[in-house]
């Protein structure tokens, strides 16, 4: 790994008004927020700034990790995955639903591996960033599934790119 890599960890509330400022200058944004409204704000800011997004989420016994490059014409953004057909402000949060600590560890470790994959992008056999691929982790079964998300040409976040 490059010894010059740095991580800028943010413990700020992020919203549509400050997202662009908080992600400015990043090579990759890792989003671990706990609600759709914030995730969509982060995704939209990443698309606008041309920064890849690695999204990781946990709810109860399930998790998901996905790498999005909606700023590129051929790849989906996070909004392509979730769409706009729901009230992002009216969804449950981790605090309301609860999460299993072991799931957070599993998803966090998986996301760290995906972040390395994105940052190495082609520099090694490990470097396929897997843009638009969503990995679902199920702690009850336990098993994983993966599928690719297509870019939505009508997406409000990246469709015009």
Give the label of every model feature segment:
Residues 1-161:
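Adenine nucleotide-associated cytosolic modules
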């Amino acid at each position: 790994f490059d010894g010059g890599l740095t991580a800028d960890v943010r413990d700020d509330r992020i919203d549509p008004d400050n997202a662009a400022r908080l992600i400015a200058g990043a090579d990759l944004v890792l989003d671990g927020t706990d609600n759709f409204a914030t995730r969509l704000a982060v995704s939209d800011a990443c698309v606008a700034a041309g920064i890849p997004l690695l999204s990781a989420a946990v709810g109860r016994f399930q998790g998901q990790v996905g790498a999005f490059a909606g700023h590129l014409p051929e790849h989906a953004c996070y909004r392509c995955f979730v769409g706009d057909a729901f009230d992002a402000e009216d969804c449950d949060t981790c605090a309301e639903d609860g999460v299993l600590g072991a799931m957070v560890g599993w998803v966090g470790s998986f996301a760290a591996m995906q972040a390395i994959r994105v940052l190495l992008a082609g520099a090694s056999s490990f470097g396929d960033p897997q843009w638009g691929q969503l990995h679902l982790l199920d702690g009850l079964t336990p098993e994983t599934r993966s599928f690719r998300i297509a870019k939505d040409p009508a997406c409000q976040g990246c469709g015009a790119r």
